[in-house]
Amino acid sequence: MTCDYTQLANNGVQQLRPYQPGKPVEELQRELGLRDVVKLASNENPLGPSHRALEAARRSLDQIHFYPDGAGFELKHALADNLGVSSDRITLGNGSNDVLELVARAYLQPGDEAVFSEYAFAIYPLVTLGCSAKPVSVDSHLYGHDLA
């Protein structure tokens, strides 16, 4: 017996299409005969990680077999101190996709509309559909966002 598990997903998830990433640098170099290419798409840093981040990662290698503090106590308090706010005003996530999905799940009901600019982050319509809400993309006005 076979089962089409995609039919079990909510209607919003059924409307999602797989992400199509940009071309790898190597493919672009081959296609266009280029040697030096700086990739600015896909939210990647062409400069690489900072030396301080690499050093912090090296110092932590002997602890990678442990789960980190899921509440991010130290990070939340350091950010709160730096920003001059209470730590309970800080929400941490695994990147902006994760935080935007948390917000969408908390506030969007099936059938709600989520309004965003045509140039908004690509995750907005995806998390909206995933919550069975309706994504509404609006045109930009004079190179800005007018969501009124």
Where are these regions (language model features)?
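Conserved core of the PLP fold type I
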Residues: 65-148
